[in-house]
């Protein structure tokens, strides 16, 4: 079955093709479809539904959409749903002029903002742990993925999953050629590697997106 992916990100297409090998995963770009919906949601799930519904209205076919991002405990969950637009401490939700920031620069700014928060001495590790934060120390961070498989405007299966880790202390320590986004600075203590250093199979097994996709598969196994 042909399933449209509401993204032109080639890395996401590869991941979804590996998780749904029995289906043909097609992006808007593959078929020359202009697709750039405005993501106005305040949650990952809201944004994934915005994208899925927008592409379904164009194609009339099943659509997979996800919205993902990284949240840093010590920064109150920043950048969260604005991860792709994050532009430093002054522009958590993106620059007012809409200018895109290179990923390497975003990585450096996020590490810098966290380092400044830690250096300020205002963070309370014990209190944070009581709130379920800092499971991996003051540098704790997690990825979230909200994924939907939409077959009608109001007919969809949804799953939300996370992957926990820490941020590296210096952008110069960023490493790994796999993955994308903040993966080169997202360290996984249990693996001793960044998310970008994992093989595709390793990442799909533990990542927020891989876990969400498998939940979707289980929900709609008969599709």
Question: Model-predicted segments: where are they?
Answer:
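Anionic-ligand binding patches
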Residues: 2-4, 11-223
């Amino acid at each position: 079955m042909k399933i449209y992916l509401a993204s032109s990100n080639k890395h996401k297409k590869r991941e979804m093709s590996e998780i749904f090998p029995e289906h043909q995963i097609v992006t808007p770009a593959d078929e020359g479809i202009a697709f750039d919906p405005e993501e106005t949601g305040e949650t990952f799930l809201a944004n994934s539904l915005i994208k899925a519904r927008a592409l379904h209205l164009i194609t009339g076919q099943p659509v997979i959409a996800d919205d993902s991002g990284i949240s840093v405990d010590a920064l109150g969950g920043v950048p969260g749903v604005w991860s792709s637009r994050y532009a430093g401490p002054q522009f958590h939700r993106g620059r007012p002029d809409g200018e895109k920031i290179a990923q390497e620069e975003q990585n450096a700014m996020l590490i810098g903002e966290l380092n400044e928060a830690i250096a300020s001495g205002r963070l309370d590790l014990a209190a944070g742990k009581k709130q379920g934060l800092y499971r991996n120390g003051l540098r704790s961070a997690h990825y979230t993925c909200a994924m939907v498989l939409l077959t009608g405007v109001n007919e969809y299966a949804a799953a939300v999953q996370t992957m926990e880790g820490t941020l590296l202390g210096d952008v110069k320590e960023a490493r790994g050629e796999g993955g994308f986004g903040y993966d080169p600075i997202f360290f996984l203590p249990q693996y001793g590697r960044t998310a970008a250093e994992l093989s595709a199979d390793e990442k799909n097994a533990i990542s927020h997106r891989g876990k969400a996709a498998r939940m979707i598969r289980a929900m709609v196994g008969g599709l």
